[in-house]
Amino acid sequence: MTATIKTLYRKLKHLKNSQEFEVNGWVVSSRGNDKIRFVTLNDGSSVENLQLVLKEDEIKKVNVDHLSLGAAVYAKGVLILTPEAKQPFELVVSELEIIGKVDNNFPIQKKETSLDFLREIPHLRHRTNLFRAIMIIRATLAYEIHQFFNKNDFINISVPIITSNDGEGAGETLLVDDESKDYFFKQKAFLGVTGQLHAEAYAAGFKNVYTFAPTFRAENSHTSRHLAEFWMIEPEMAFATLKDDIKIADSMLKTVIKNTIEKCPDEMKLLDFLKDNTLLPTLNEFIHKKITVLDYKVAVKKLLEHKYRFEEKNIYFGMDLASEHEKFISESIVKGPVAIINYPKDIKAFYMYQNADNKTVACFDLLVPGIGELIGGSQRESRYEKLVTRMAELNIPQEPLQWYLDLRKYGYAPSSGFGLGFERLVMYVTGISNIRDVIPFPRVAGTIKM
């Protein structure tokens, strides 16, 4: 019977001595002599390893020099329970085959390797235990997000990656150019910065929809928080207010994080250890703490009371909160998750619903301790003329977005939604401080690997 290491650990209570199993994986370590050899194996299904025990007869059949770190092997043998040992079981090998040898210049070695170096080899870094844990958590979070929306009757829609418009109106789009005289699409085309506008179209027919897709920003930023290509989760709900929007965002985050912790205990244990056992308490506190809703103008007032703490001390109504401000609000003022609502319209996107004061818009940024902004959302502007006027104020061309404007003419119901940067969520759950370490192949300004 072929088994993964994850399956063996899951079924530990039901395992019996001398059961026969077949396993595949990569060598983590190999030690021993001519009489007995211990080979540690990992197959990528878990951060936990399996110890293979080779006795004299099997050792003679293989070249032990080829059992080096990273070598791909197949093994068959009987499982022996070892409850008193460090590992709960081991596989006594009756057959071993080296499927793929490793050159001596394999970049990953037993000694600790820096994250900076591992970023130079994104095609190999997942073969370290740290990145194995990160990517397993990432995959589980993605699964749980789909599960959450399915259980809440949302329809998953596929939005285009190539688009004719800048959905955020910020001019940070990447142009698709085939270098021909005539545009391939007979007009300029861009890599999408958001799927929200297309999601709005489908919400006006399916009521509750969501997208989970790559998005692109031509931001020339070289920070630990920015990527040129990243994944976004963007639900859109017809007949929904800002209050409904915040409620579903809060529920989604807490459900997804809770379920991921439960399903990935070994990976979370490793990551918690690397954060001095502070990661799991932080996440569990978030899961159980009620979200606070705070008006932007109140947040600015509270920041003014503590402005001496900040590098950016020029705090005023109309400013876009910096990362240090967001973290301070969630960590020191609220001491938990907080939704900042009603930002000034001049620092937010054109499609947000304009409040009666004509100065602010019905939107929210959800902030969490340790990372700051995790989600941004809003109630959408449902009034055709208001939307046209706002686009004109921002010099956003109307023609490419006429289809979006026309939605307001054809049975449009008040709509709300939000965007969650998936990599920001992975950072929060894993405790990893650099966004380039939570995506398999990071794309940033100035360089592209693979």
Swiss-Prot record:
One of its GO terms (cellular component) is cytoplasm. Belongs to the class-II aminoacyl-tRNA synthetase family. GO terms for molecular function: asparagine-tRNA ligase activity; ATP binding; nucleic acid binding. Homodimer. Keywords: Aminoacyl-tRNA synthetase, ATP-binding, Cytoplasm, Ligase, Nucleotide-binding, Protein biosynthesis. It catalyses: tRNA(Asn) + L-asparagine + ATP = L-asparaginyl-tRNA(Asn) + AMP + diphosphate + H(+). InterPro entries: Aa-tRNA-synt_II (IPR004364), aa-tRNA-synth_II (IPR006195), aa-tRNA-synth_II/BPL/LPL (IPR045864), Asn-tRNA-ligase (IPR004522), Asp/Asn-tRNA-synth_IIb (IPR002312), NA-bd_OB-fold (IPR012340), NA-bd_OB_tRNA (IPR004365). Gene3D superfamilies: Bira Bifunctional Protein, Domain 2, Nucleic acid-binding proteins. It is found in: Cytoplasm. It comes from Metamycoplasma arthritidis (strain 158L3-1) (Mycoplasma arthritidis). Its EC number is 6.1.1.22. The keyword Metal-binding does not apply. This is Asparagine--tRNA ligase. GO terms for biological process: asparaginyl-tRNA aminoacylation.
